[in-house]
Amino acid sequence: MRKERLIAPILAVIAVAWMVAQLLSSVLFERSLRQALEDLEARGEWRVSRTESRQGWLTSQGSLLLSPLLGRPWRLELSYHARHGVLSTDVEGTLLPRLDSALQKAVGEVSAPSIPRWQGRYHTLSGHSELRLALAPFVIQQNGRELDVRGARMRLEGMFGDWRTRVLLDQLTLTDGLAQLTLGPVVLESRYTYIEDAYHFAQRDHLHIEHIALHYPAYDVQVTPIDIHSHMVLDESELRLKGKLIIGEVRVPSEAPETPLLGGRIEAELSRLNGDAVRQTIRRLRQEAAWGDRSLPMAEGLLARLETDLLKVLSDSPRLDVTAVVIDSPLLGLSVDADGALFFDARRLDELSVLGLEKPEERARWLERIDGDFIWHDAPTVAALWLGLPLGTRELQFDVIRGVWRVNGRPMPVLWP
């Protein structure tokens, strides 16, 4: 009898615990979603807004609107429906791209069998989230041109401070009359780590394109494969961007079916971009977006208002280090092994104008701020011949002095009209 009397209190405790867990799951999901949207907006690249939100114990639903911070050529309307559980929340929804009238006219008709749907899961205890999206094949047609995309998939996972993205594309084909460009499979892997408000952040990206084929009636060009690596870091003092391009083989089968045209790699790093100025520019962009009309592009005169901040980004004398240019051309019998650096003179920045770069005189003033040097090691004889140097010259020293190029102490000859 005593045990029977305990059943009701135990069931009541279990029911209360379940209700509390459900409520906690709903609250934590909402907090995680809000934090993720704030983190996305803190990057300074996106405008994010919630057009609808209904939170409940068992389910929540809503819709989001994402668009580029600069301009409004397109936007993404994302809806979600969340089913809360004690340990996790399952989420699903739709993803609908919208184009502005000008871009819609330029793109033309889009043929897709259904609205893209996505699925995801939020783990209540760890705060880890994952999202999966698979696009049905679609075709865009305009004035005889056609873009055919097949096998597009995306996976996004992570938690506050650390997000990973993986995008897969089986094949993309662009047809314009008798010309055709085909590429794929394509894999993009990205990792983004940051602290609150993206004061410091780092992002690594790796794009791998297994095969590219360009077909013209007269000839074909094939590239296999291409890898692009990038690493961007914003720390206390500076923004650094490092990149590497690796090209496997470029072939022209109609001209030389057995011999590659070229292959190689290029590595470079841009550094000394003032960190505080970068953060201030991002804040100003977010302010401009907040003040403007969500349906319209950025207000006129934006570049003029940002000019001071943009010039401050250059205040630490940025430098571009080209650490490796290694290119080999079996078909032409040429090889390049070069490295060097360029430096920007940041003194008297108030004498420069970003707005005036469209004028030749202003562009000349900017070029005068650039100095640097490059060395082409073990250069072929034909390169010395092109540059008007003695045929026995094996090392080419390129100097940039106030924007003017010299080679081995001589003025750079005019290589083309």
Segments (PLM) and residue ranges:
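Glycine-rich, small/hydroxylated-residue low-complexity segments
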Residues: R5-A12, V16-P417
